[in-house]
Amino acid sequence: MSGIKALKIGDLVLQRPVIQGGMGVGISLHKLAGAVAASGGMGLISTAQIGFREPDFKTNFVEANLRAIRREMQKAREIAPKGTIGFNIMVATKHYDLWVKVAIKSGADAIVSGAGLPVRLPEYAQAAYEEMKAGVADAKENCEEFCKQAVKKVKLAPIVSSAKSAQVICRLWDRKYKQVPDFVVVEGPLAGGHLGFSREELAEYGADTKDVPNTYNQEAYDKEVRSIMEVVKTYEEKYQKHIPVVTAGGIYTHEDVKHQFELGAEG
């Protein structure tokens, strides 16, 4: 599709405004993420059971996953040295804080986090920066330049499904951490994975039937997306910072993509 604008997230620029979704347990790994990043989008590696191929996964799954996070990022970088590569990390998983910290230390450009609201994501990111800086300082007497590299700020994005959840996460990050998301991912009721909708809400949108193309109420969820954007706009104005909104779910065709851009989505 001609005329598509690049997606700008702070100092990151995606020439293709596409963020590949996180699909766990062996789908969103280095090959897929690297290929997307090499094509100008953002490739995401899923940390969900990422170390399942490690020989000690069943007996030492924490270390197995940590090794796999580092390795998958390294391999993705080999595919797309200058590409934008991040991680999809589910809040609901055990040791969430460890996955966040090692993802940052491995050189992630972004972390997208859902399956629950990532209320402590900024805290864990800051802990990673401090650990990195301390490690570099220990290794180098004159660490000024190295420390600057060590604390490269990773772009943080919550996944939300409603204006209410967007308001909750933005307000909490604002009050507790004096920061806001770098971008926001909106997962609609037609998205795959761990959705933030009750059965009643899915029924309300007509997304719980065997004939979704004919029952889905696009207009109703479009209204919710606009409300989410209004919430984000409030915090953009407060922080004088652009916060792109990226939509996901039920986007299959050229017309679907065009519709999302017309709503105000940037990816």
How would you name each of these model-derived features?
Residues M1-Y239:
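Active-site entrance/lid segments in N-terminal catalytic domains of soluble metabolic enzymes
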Residues V257-G267:
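A compact, surface-exposed functional segment
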Residues V225, H254-V257:
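A general structural signal for well-ordered alpha-helical packing
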